[in-house]
Amino acid sequence: MIQIARTWRVFAGGMATGFIGVVLVTAGKASADPLLPPPPIPAPVSAPATVPPVQNLTALPGGSSNRFSPAPAPAPIASPIPVGAPGSTAVPPLPPPVTPAISGTLRDHLREKGVKLEAQRPHGFKALDITLPMPPRWTQVPDPNVPDAFVVIADRLGNSVYTSNAQLVVYRLIGDFDPAEAITHGYIDSQKLLAWQTTNASMANFDGFPSSIIEGTYRENDMTLNTSRRHVIATSGADKYLVSLSVTTALSQAVTDGPATDAIVNGFQVVAHAAPAQAPAPAPGSAPVGLPGQAPGYPPAGTLTPVPPR
């Protein structure tokens, strides 16, 4: 048994040696053949990019919520409408700035134009609605020192030697003149006062009328006075009126009387008196018409006052 096994081993070893030789010969022949290119290695697949959540995107009205979708084409920008094109609203030009005159008071200018100043009185005056506030402690007073006074109010209970007051004069202007040109002379009468110093001035329209206002200080009887003076050229119907208001107080009382004088200056108004609207006249031959099925109505009877029994 042992011999047989050894013989088998020799035979198996010979067979193995022969097989290896065949393999080597075959491999040698195969190595002489041209090498084929290796197959392409597939590229690694990248992980999909992380898309931010939709709730963090700002959605436009009518737009797409998908940030990767094609964006809509932008709306064409409308070209500006040229000035003066049909359908455009024309902006009225600003009025030219008013240049104050350097000489000649307002009254002097009107007289040079041949305009007559006719003083007006408050009784029966209806051409203009003039508002003059009356502060506490102030009363209407007669003042012979104010020529052609329309109304004068003053604080007779003040502590100053000088009585704080407001003077209003109204003139009807008879004659032809240019109100816009005339009002440029509104500063001159104040600027001629002794030691005049301007603190504020304006020629802006007042309640729609040409107007001038100038404020400042001047000297009178060894006192320094503080004053505000306004001129208004108002139109009522075919007539023109010069309305002038001056509010004056002692400089030492300017702070104490400030609320009162400010109330007068800021509350002053000049408005053209509006004529009452007239009811349209009935058509000739027309009669009052009643409700359907009723006889024509009669005009309403007047209010009757009951007579007490005798």
UniProtKB/Swiss-Prot annotation:
The keyword 4Fe-4S does not apply. GO terms for cellular component: extracellular region. Keywords: Signal. Pfam families: Lpp-LpqN. Residues 278-310 are annotated as: Disordered. Residues 1-32 form the signal peptide. Coiled coil: none annotated. This is Proline-rich 28 kDa antigen. InterPro entries: Lipoprotein_LpqN/LpqT-like (IPR019674). To M.leprae ML0031.
